[in-house]
Amino acid sequence: FQAEDGIRDQPRSRGLGDVYKRQAVSFVLAGTGVPVAKHGNYSATSKSGAANVLKSLSVNIDCGIDMVQKSLDNVGICFLLAPKHHSAMKYVGKIRQEIGIRTVFNLLGPLSNPALVKKQLLGVYDKSLILPFAESLKTLGSTHAWIVHGSDGLDEVTITGKTYCAELKNGLIREFSINPSDIDIPSAKLTDIIGGEPEENAKEINELFNGKKSTFRNVVILNSASALVATGHANSLEEGAGKSIISLDSGEALRKLEELIKITNS
């Protein structure tokens, strides 16, 4: 099993429950034609993990490898539940939940996508991890990647202010930063972009895909644009934002969600 492009589930950031935005981004990317191999788990240190949100969206996340491959081949997006594809993970999940704080697994998880994707956007929960992760991805064979950390502490591209970034491309690493104003997206407060329980997050994703204009839409567009640049499917944030908006407004992102629900439950 292998996918050329992908956006992975990142380490939790302060337990703020922000992971649901990345689920929306995955479907937006798939709606632009980028194959997406999501790798994630149930929440261990935050309100809502990738698996929690997708389950609330009615996606069957307990699929075997054959169905995962079929989803990627036929829909353009798949989800790999960590305990099913890394057998050791199922023995530590309960312990991680009981501990309730970040552990080494928050660092190992983003580096262990079973799809072996070579291009990705990856968020880290501390600015000091940006370069070490870039070096690690280089060693693991990634060809193009962005590693990001929001100045507000989020492990994603933020719209509250600056996002610190490192780009790995052709074996070279460069550092830079981006701001929402770079593509004319208004800034927002941190409280405006933090998610809640899985059901709430799923509801907001469905509303987004059905045309709701909101701060959530803005942060999804900025993260999707960044992911398109990071995977070589856009040459600039402006181009990436344009493709992301088309994916949302044309209904392609929603169609990808509906197709994934259908195929994983067939």
Put a short name on every predicted segment.
Residues 14, 41-46, 85, 151-152:
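Acidic, glycine-rich active-site loops and adjacent beta-strand->loop/helix elements
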Residues 18-71:
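A generic, well-ordered mixed alpha/beta core segment in the N-terminal half of proteins
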Residues 1-20:
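Single conserved hydrophobic/aromatic residue that forms the stacking wall/gate
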Residues 33, 55-62, 67-266:
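Glycine-rich anion-binding loops and their surrounding alpha/beta cores
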